[in-house]
């Protein structure tokens, strides 16, 4: 290929001269403001059979943009042509330079001149396919000669700007649905807004006639490409000459077989539900990618027309439009003539599959989620049936449990498998309904712990009975409800309310008033918070409101059951009015305690 560019007598000594890139094209993922930089590297290869006299050996990379359009001619005047061409990027490498008016002799042999450059992510992508409008990059390698024609070889470079795997266009479905009163209920949708160039677009139709005797006529689906060209996009002060044009890329016509295609939709009404596939062209000359760079803006949309044959004989037409974005995938190579290298349906399907694995799955299609081996995921989905707002399963919620987190270190140091852990969790969930005796539960737990080599306090009562044990002075969580209604034998988290009601949640959210708080005693600053059993015991034998010990009502409201908390609060509020009739020395005593508490703080 390179030899066709050679000229002059010394060119016969040149056996090989070419530009070899490490990557066939450069890929930017994301828009111009978010894409990361990319490295372009390669080698300039030279093979000489005999010595060659040369002034220099150079390599240039040039980025050129051109915007041009032709206005149609009329009878009054001829056609008018508007155009603008600009070099927006240049990079040069000089491998050999003999100096001004000098030459050097390149000995016979093989030469490799490596080169590399960092391309910013904001660089324009290649736009090729239109006759006089483009954005291109070209390499030009040159061997300068003094008394002969220069030896030149050229190579194009394609820069692709594709979508990032987290782009919303890859996961958001596009749909238009509405009801034409007394005519038809319709829904037209596409699985995603973004479509890979060279593949196909799937369009899903759902048509439900609302008028008896209404028939569906011809259904036309079109892919429209719009061109918006601007001569001076960078200069806001100059006259912005613009030109707009559209062309039809795909035209699909379909007619329903009313007898065979009629079906029951959503178990409610009879209608038609089907899909159509619009195959995209395999060449950029017939279909461009969506872009907006260097005064060239390309956009695509789907237009639909559905004929409705009314019973009275007149014809109505339903029209709808959906936006669609076409992008070039790096997995489908494009040759120098702007055609797909592999145009088989299998290659297009592979590109779609690769894209599906890179993009995050849809909410209902999480087939790529990683699961633990041999773990049955049934029962682990939250919220469960009948669950309250934002409430997960009681036995599976770690936020509501009071397990000893320090004891989990023993679990991580053993070779326990995920299946064994799942078995223990399943047994724990089942024990909530069977309620075995404390002796049987302890015996079974000890045997299981010895078999697995795990400390006995894991899932044990000590996890919730004392959240401030020496084994875990800091790693603790808010205790659950065990211990108040005779649940001391139930492991941590087993007495968590399974379906908390709104009234219980409201009771748990109550906070003592300021007047209640000032009458409470204040402990020393260096004292620790009371443990769960101490709070429950204190809450069971509640003192009168004249005693400052009632300050623990907030802690009891969190740890005890919801019904108990409501009684406490009601009793506390009733006592507020009775305390106003108490003796005067009680008020003085409370004021003195308050002053002492503030002094300690």
UniProtKB/Swiss-Prot annotation:
Regions of compositional bias (Basic and acidic residues) in chain numbering: 475-489
Bias (Low complexity) ranges: 461-473
GO biological process: regulation of protein ubiquitination; ubiquitin-dependent endocytosis
Segments forming a coiled coil: none
A family per Pfam: Arrestin_C
GO MF terms, alphabetically ordered: protein-macromolecule adaptor activity; ubiquitin protein ligase binding
Keyword Cell inner membrane: no
Region (Disordered): 374-397, 455-489
Iron is among the record's keywords: no
PANTHER family per UniProt: ARRESTIN DOMAIN CONTAINING PROTEIN (PTHR11188), FI21816P1 (PTHR11188:SF17)
Subunit structure: Interacts with hulA.
Family of the protein in this entry: Belongs to the arrestin family.
Record function comment: Component of the regulatory network controlling carbon source utilization through ubiquitination and deubiquitination involving creA, creB, creC, creD and acrB. May be involved in signaling by recognizing appropriately phosphorylated substrates via its arrestin domains and then recruit a HECT-type ubiquitin ligase such as hulA, leading to ubiquitination of the substrate, providing a link between ubiquitination and phosphorylation in protein regulation and stability.
Protein's name according to its UniProt entry: Probable HECT-type ubiquitin ligase-interacting protein creD
